[in-house]
């Protein structure tokens, strides 16, 4: 969308009736009574929809000793219509913002409304997916992005692999459709922390076609770090050209970094053979091998900004990657 703001990356080597009204209405029913009844019906309908989408209804029934028939009903995969759907000035493409997440609620409360405002000002059709890992394994950012890719709406045609603690501040940053190749928004020249030339983390845009071509990301990286370096090799192996922003003059003030290492410790432990394995290229696994279960899918509004929270339970083959647990 903004070709003047993109450049090829300069590299070293070129994801019946209601029970509330049973028995009918009394003969003399005031307008006030009708209003209260309608309001109550609306409230309980919304409450039932929320519980049924999150799976809480099934859990509540089982808690009362009753059996449910089949798994909890999944919410519709398509996000609700947005105000821009009929506005051609917003362009034909739609972005799925994939946010790997675990226990960073303070950052999330800032991230969702900020990204909503930022992308709306740029007229980027989008929907935010919070990929919340709820199993007991170590955090796996790459596998969560694979899940987000598979579970995102078919109406989206490109993705942003987006850290929850990195907020774009410069309005000239391009979040448009990356037709020519993967676009690394948080380039080494602009990221507040990481400056090596092969870095592709933080914020990376890819078309869904190109992400499939790379077979997604490796699922072998449990704990913090290195999954982006392996994905860089996948990008090059797929024959794709990596692009980065050009003409941005705000330097390391281009983004706001929310992470506080003093109270938000990262899991940087290397267990068993993980230290040796982390530098290898996973030539077999990826999008086609990720194993998971979506425990619930819930539509939320954070500060008036809509998003979808996927509670995800990843599966780990402890024979192949014993470092997925701390034991």
UniProtKB/Swiss-Prot annotation:
**Which residues lie in coiled coils?**
none
Positions bound to UDP-alpha-D-galactose: 100-104, 139-141, 164-165, 194, 224, 257-259, 266
Q: Which InterPro entries match?
A: Galactosyl_T, Galactosyl_T_C, Galactosyl_T_N, Nucleotide-diphossugar_trans
| Residue numbers on the Cytoplasmic membrane side | 1-30
Q: Which residues are connected by disulfide bridges in this protein?
A: 316-324
Stretches in topological domain Lumenal: 52-327
- According to the record, glycans are attached at 154
Q: Where is this region: Disordered?
A: 63-87
Cofactor(s) listed: Mn(2+)
Any one GO BP annotation for this protein: glycosaminoglycan biosynthetic process
Disease the record associates with this protein: Ehlers-Danlos syndrome, spondylodysplastic type, 1: A form of Ehlers-Danlos syndrome, a group of connective tissue disorders characterized by skin hyperextensibility, articular hypermobility, and tissue fragility. EDSSPD1 is an autosomal recessive form characterized by short stature, developmental anomalies of the forearm bones and elbow, and bowing of extremities, in addition to the classic features of Ehlers-Danlos syndrome.
Role this protein plays: Required for the biosynthesis of the tetrasaccharide linkage region of proteoglycans, especially for small proteoglycans in skin fibroblasts.
Q: What is this protein called?
A: Beta-1,4-galactosyltransferase 7
